[in-house]
A protein has these predicted regions:
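N-terminal subdomain of lithium-sensitive/metallo-dependent phosphomonoesterases centered on the IMPase/IPPase/PAP
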Residues: 1-94
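DPxDG-like acidic metal-binding loop motif
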Residues: 83-111
Length: 111
């Protein structure tokens, strides 16, 4: 795994700090809207995915791709964006989708 150069960490810190603020506004705009729920598991078991999961992941991916176009992105809902970069972003747009579905505010995003 590559080492982030000492002077580069500020770029990532600033980006993630701004992304967190943008995500808060984006999530807040979506919370009062209805969403569709489907089961990712076909057959046995239940693993919900919502239209919000997909919208949030698209939003996060777009921000990362705009700032770091060569970085690899691995997302729970849309898989990998392959790249030759040594840098990878891993996204779970709604960690705690079951809680999100029932209106329990104990969910978050993971980047």
């Amino acid at each position: 795994m590559p080492q982030i150069k000492k002077f580069n960490y500020k770029i990532y810190y600033k980006f993630l700090n701004n992304l967190a603020k943008e995500l808060t506004r984006f999530y807040t705009s979506k919370l009062s809207k209805s969403f569709k729920v489907t089961n990712k598991l076909k057959g046995r078991g239940y693993d919900p995915v919502t239209s919000s999961d997909k919208a949030f992941e698209r939003f996060i991916r777009s921000k990362i791709t705009k700032k770091f176009p060569n970085h690899q992105i691995i997302g729970e809902e849309f898989g990998k964006k392959k790249s030759d970069s040594n840098y990878s972003w891993v996204i779970d747009p709604i960690d705690g989708t079951r809680s999100y579905v029932i209106g329990n505010p104990s969910w978050s995003n993971l980047i």
